[in-house]
Regions:
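PLP-dependent enzyme catalytic core of the Aspartate aminotransferase-like
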Residues: 102, 237, 283-296, 300-333
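Active-site phosphate-binding strand-loop segment of PLP-dependent enzymes
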Residues: 91-162
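Conserved glycine-rich beta-strand-loop-beta hairpin in the small C-terminal domain of fold type I
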Residues: 226-233, 245-257, 263-275, 305
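Conserved PLP-anchoring active-site segment centered on the Schiff-base-forming lysine
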Residues: 55-77, 90
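Alpha-helix termini
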Residues: 29-31, 136-147, 200-206, 332-333
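N-terminal small-domain helix-loop-helix segment of the aminotransferase-like
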Residues: 1-44, 51, 228, 235-238, ...
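A short helix-loop-beta submotif of the ANL/AMP-binding
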Residues: 79-85
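Conserved core segment of the aminotransferase class I/II
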Residues: 175-246, 250-253, 323, 329
Length: 333
């Protein structure tokens, strides 16, 4: 390619060839009907979220998400001038707590923000969960006389374990904006490349995409890197060998259960979210750190009393950690 095509400025919406290939890849995999006009190239899923949040809201609007949730949602929504409401977790399943959602939905809610497969729990929202969420949002949109958008944050979409029910969320609700990153699927997190996909039948779909370059100007994100846009155009639809994550999950989950930890089995990602062995998960994680276990307290994910394990490491390191988890559990007996 001409060096200018690789290193020059790209069009504001992203390189057309890349957008076309992404749309075609989604349609082939999920039976959808995206066109290039429905795709906006972004600086990773975070960049896609920054655009999605601003494209379908006004400052002061309310966004609802579900615990446990990615800790960065708080600054992301605050930066857009939005109120973030976090629905308490159903700690037995980590599926959506619908009873709590129904009490919080009101006419000021512009969008629901979900993350499946989920960071930090590793849980994948089931088809039943997504169908129920779609039904509720459809009914409430009619009641409030405005669309309630569903912003689906999906950087872990391709890390799904064998036999897990993993619906493509946009196929169940037209007013869906999907935020995707290639960082996990092809193991390129430092390249910060992703996209926003707006369902073709989404309310004001054309306007949502059209406003994105203007949003880029206001937040200083002036286009995803041209070189990486060209790169992902040739690999969309492919993934790295992600099997190590499922291997690590099986080893870790079975061992923790044997040692007495309570944990909902992950359906994807490379995270696990067990209950802490004491109510204060921050204190528990400090004790773990003294044994060289680096864990993250659940408090920052809106779910105290739990902790996150990341097992995106060589399997030998997971196996090396097992005796330490066992010893830690024994100290609480």
């Amino acid at each position: 390619l001409d060096p200018l095509a690789l290193h020059g400025y790209s069009p504001s919406f992203g390189i057309m060839e890349t957008r076309e290939k992404i749309a075609a890849s989604l349609n082939k995999k999920y039976g959808s009907d995206y066109k290039a006009a429905n795709i906006f190239m972004a600086i990773g899923a975070a960049g896609a979220l920054a655009h999605a949040l601003r494209a379908v809201t006004n400052p002061g609007d309310e966004i609802i998400t579900f615990a446990p949730c990615f800790s960065e949602y708080k600054p992301y929504t605050a930066g857009a001038g939005l109120k973030l409401t976090i629905i308490p977790a159903d700690i037995d399943t980590f599926q959506i707590n619908f009873e709590a959602l129904k009490t919080q939905l009101n006419e000021n809610v512009s969008a629901i923000l979900i993350n499946s497969p989920n960071n930090p729990s590793g849980i994948v929202y089931s088809t039943e969960t997504i169908e129920k969420l779609s039904s509720i949002l459809t009914a409430k949109s009619k009641e409030f006389h405005h669309p309630i958008y569903l912003i689906s944050d999906e950087p872990y979409r391709d890390i799904i374990f064998e036999g897990v029910d993993a619906p493509y969320i946009a196929n169940y609700y037209n007013n869906t904006l999907t935020c995707y990153s290639f960082s996990k699927s092809i193991s390129l997190p430092g390249e910060r490349i992703g996209y926003l996909a707006v369902h073709p039948d989404c309310s004001d779909a054309d306007k949502i995409i059209e406003i994105c370059p203007q949003i880029s100007r206001t937040i200083g994100q002036n286009g995803a890197a041209s070189l990486m846009q060209r790169t992902v155009a040739d690999v969309c639809g492919y993934t790295s060998d992600l099997s190590v994550y499922e291997t690590n999950k099986k080893i870790l989950f079975e061992a923790l259960r044997e040692y007495g930890y309570h944990c909902v089995e992950p359906g994807g990602t490379f995270y696990m979210f067990p209950r802490s062995l004491e109510p204060d998960s921050q204190a528990f994680c400090k004790k773990a750190m003294e044994k060289d276990l680096m864990l993250v307290p659940g408090d920052i994910f809106g779910c105290p009393g739990h902790f996150r394990i990341a097992y995106c490491v060589p399997t030998q390191r997971v196996e090396k950690a097992l005796p330490v988890f066992k010893k830690l559990a024994e100290e609480y007996r």
